[in-house]
Design a protein with these regions (language model features):
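Membrane-interface amphipathic segments in extracytoplasmic regions
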Residues: 1-206
Length: 206
């Protein structure tokens, strides 16, 4: 869930590790929950100009290669969003085949989840979550990275968000090996191609 109150706005990008932040925010005071994983632009429709200038806006991003593995295992083995799969075991039971399917014309990118396009909702560059409709980045005070959450999260929530009781546990964890073990040459390059903006902007490497 993306979360908002009168002091801060958290943009929860799917499978970026933001579940632990959502849990902490929900447990620490007056938070307005707006739907599912909403983009920053959509969240700002709930904010007036006066409140906007005072909001501390933050989000979490994740290495795209790692994020896609997490997404695959979470959606497949929890039977969540079955529409993300083909119904063909040869494709769905093999990560590399699934990656190829997702980025092929066989996958219907126009499906809707809630009120948003399913491809935009789950499979776009994470930067798109914090851009406006013109493709420009919207003000964000802090972009945390999943890879550093273990070391940064407690201090960030206490010092910046002023939370006192911190929950430090994974929310919706997936069980799998290191992401690099799941890729072949082609799938690795597909993710590099489709997530080139994230990879370049956040300096991610395979």
């Amino acid at each position: 869930m993306s979360l908002l109150n009168d002091k801060y706005l958290f943009v929860h990008i799917n499978k970026s590790g933001g579940g632990i932040i959502t849990k902490n925010l929900e447990n620490n005071g007056n938070v307005k929950i707006n739907g599912y994983h909403r983009t920053l632009e959509k969240m700002l429709t709930f904010v007036n100009e006066t409140n906007y200038s005072n909001l501390y806006i933050f989000t979490v991003v994740r290495n795209p290669w790692d994020r896609m593995v997490s997404m695959y295992f979470y959606y497949k083995y929890k039977n969540y969003h079955p529409e993300f799969f083909s119904g063909n075991e040869e494709i769905d039971d093999n990560f590399n085949n699934w990656i190829e399917y997702i980025y092929s014309s066989k996958f219907d990118r126009n499906r809707l989840h809630s009120d948003v396009n399913v491809f935009t909702y789950c499979f776009c560059n994470q930067l798109n979550w914090i851009k406006n409709k013109n493709g420009n980045l919207i003000r964000v005070n802090k972009i945390l990275q999943f890879e550093n959450l273990k070391n940064e999260l407690n201090d960030f929530l206490k010092e910046k968000i002023k939370l006192k009781n911190i929950i430090d546990e994974k929310i919706h964890p997936t069980n799998h090996d290191h992401y690099s073990k799941y890729y072949n040459k082609d799938s690795k390059e597909l993710v590099r191609k489709y997530y080139s903006e994230d990879i370049e902007f956040f300096n991610y490497k395979f």
